[in-house]
Every structure is written in structure tokens, then in C-alpha cells.
């Protein structure tokens, strides 16, 4: 175990990416099965999840585990994926 070097930066980025993927999946399931994107419950879940991820990114940035630009890129990528998912959902209805 002493010989195993842990790269906390890579681990932090990977965990944040997993959380972003989880948010995308959660919203996809909600759009497919539960509510419309205009529904207040949908918007509340999305806002809460995005806020939580932004706080995680802020925390990791403050610890020096990720660069601020990397955090911004992660949020931007997730926002684009969610926007595409929203457009796809609206075109099906």
C-alpha cells in the first residue's frame, strides 16, 4: 500500500465526471418517465443537482485538485448534454 501512489487530482476529476453522468441519467429517467421539462418538480431537481455539482467542483478547485477551467468545462459539457436531452425530449412530444 505504501508503494501505491494515489493521484488525487485524477481521482477528483473522475468522481466529478461520474457525478455529472449520474445527473444526466437522473434527468433522462425523469424526462422519459415522470414529468415534462416545464414541470416545477423537474426544474427543482435539475437546479438542485446542478447546484450540488457546482459546489463539489468549487470545493475540489479550492483544494487544488482541479483547475478552475476544468471545472467550468465539466459544467459546460453537462449543460450542453442536458440541453440536447431537453431538445430531444421536446421533439418526441
Swiss-Prot record:
Gene3D superfamilies hit by this protein: SO2669-like (1.10.287.750)
TM region positions: none
Domain of life: Bacteria
Family annotation (InterPro entries): UPF0358, UPF0358_sf
Pfam families found in the cross-reference section: DUF1507
Family that this chain belongs to: Belongs to the UPF0358 family.
Protein name: UPF0358 protein LMHCC_1561
Amino acid at each position: 500500500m505504501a508503494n501505491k501512489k494515489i493521484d488525487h487530482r485524477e481521482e477528483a476529476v473522475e468522481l466529478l465526471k461520474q457525478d455529472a453522468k449520474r445527473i444526466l441519467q437522473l434527468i433522462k429517467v425523469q424526462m422519459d418517465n415522470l414529468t415534462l421539462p416545464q414541470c416545477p418538480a423537474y426544474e427543482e431537481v435539475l437546479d438542485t443537482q446542478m447546484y450540488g455539482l457546482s459546489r463539489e467542483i468549487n470545493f475540489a478547485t479550492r483544494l487544488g485538485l482541479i483547475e478552475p477551467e476544468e471545472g467550468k468545462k465539466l459544467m459546460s459539457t453537462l449543460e450542453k448534454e442536458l440541453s440536447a436531452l431537453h431538445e430531444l425530449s421536446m421533439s418526441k412530444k
